[in-house]
Design a protein with these regions (language model features):
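Glycine-rich phosphate-binding loops of nucleotide-dependent enzymes
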Residues: 1-158
Length: 158
């Protein structure tokens, strides 16, 4: 797995939010974006996930230019995101929230059960609360749920 960002520029109308960043992430690496408020960290992640349009430059994943690939197809390629601010479905149960993470992997019940077991091993508190509405969890538990949901898609990049 290799994620490569080449001279990425992203605009919000006439405002250039990302001004020519380049990054390479190889399999097994952990990379952190650090910067002041408004520096473009969230915009960068949204652009990698396909939620923001690339103005110029390129995003390559395993050698394939995915700059114009829609967000839902990027999930199929193995790119997932645990959204900022937890971003869970508050009216859905913990289990239903987790199931949403594997939505693109239809008809794979055995894999889903295996993945649920893995998530519950990582976050035992989620198993205890599997039938509880996500919105009733504490802030930390909601973050666990958001990460667990992202992991349910079996991402190559999170």
């Amino acid at each position: 797995m290799r994620l490569e960002i080449r001279d990425l520029h992203v605009h919000y109308d006439k405002i250039e939010a990302i001004k020519g960043i380049s990054v390479v992430v190889n399999e097994g690496e952990i990379v952190t974006l650090i910067g002041a408020n408004g520096a473009g960290k969230t915009t960068t992640l949204k652009t990698i996930s396909g939620l923001r349009k690339v103005s110029s430059g390129a995003i390559l994943f395993d050698g394939q230019d995915i700059s114009k690939v829609p967000a839902h197809e990027r999930v199929d390629l193995g790119i997932s995101q645990a959204p900022e601010g937890r971003g869970i479905f508050p009216g859905m149960t913990v289990l239903e929230n987790l199931e949403m993470g594997k939505f693109h992997r239809k008809n794979r019940k055995a894999e889903m059960n295996e993945d649920l077991d893995n998530i519950y091993t990582l976050f035992p508190r989620l198993k205890e609360r599997s039938s509880q509405a996500g919105g009733t969890l504490s802030g930390g538990e909601q973050q666990m749920l958001a990460i667990g949901r992202a992991l349910m898609s079996r991402p190559k990049v999170l």
